[in-house]
Amino acid sequence: MSPSESFNSFSLFSTLSMFKFLTQITFSRPFVYSALNKGCPDFLITSNCIHGNSWPHLSNLFEVKNFLMPSEDPPQLQNCKVIFLHGNTNAPTPLRPMEFRAIAFTTISPYIRVCVST
């Protein structure tokens, strides 16, 4: 799936939820921008792996207005499908070009954890 293709959260969710083990998929930033700009309700940004000083930069970068910041993983996240995490705790402002890795944890609950990789 290319970054220019329209984002279909249900299709992506259905594909990844078939796995019963940890799965990683790489997305480009434009792909993620497109998904977030469409206001997909299945997206959630969490601070679980975001350094405190990096969180404001990340939220501004994606222009996400409605987000949750749960303090822990399940059960708080058991109803979430997609979660964005910033995996680089030393990112400068603005964040340098990175790839996004989606990790599906379907043994606990059907949601996708998306992390930024440097």
From Swiss-Prot:
Q: Where in the cell is it found?
A: Mitochondrion
Keyword DNA repair (UniProt):
no
Q: Which UniProt keywords apply?
A: Mitochondrion
What do the Gene Ontology cellular component annotations say?
mitochondrion
Question: Any extra detail in the entry?
Answer: Although initially predicted to be a dubious gene because of an almost complete overlap with MRPL51, it shows transcript and protein level expression.
Q: Source species, please?
A: Saccharomyces cerevisiae (strain ATCC 204508 / S288c) (Baker's yeast)
Q: Where is the signal peptide?
A: none
Which coarse location class applies to the principal site listed for this UniProt protein? mitochondrion
Protein name according to UniProt:
Mitochondrial protein YPR099C
The entry summarizes the disruption phenotype as follows: Has a respiratory growth defect. Shows partial growth on nonfermentable carbon source.
Say what the protein does: Essential for the functional mitochondria and respiratory growth.
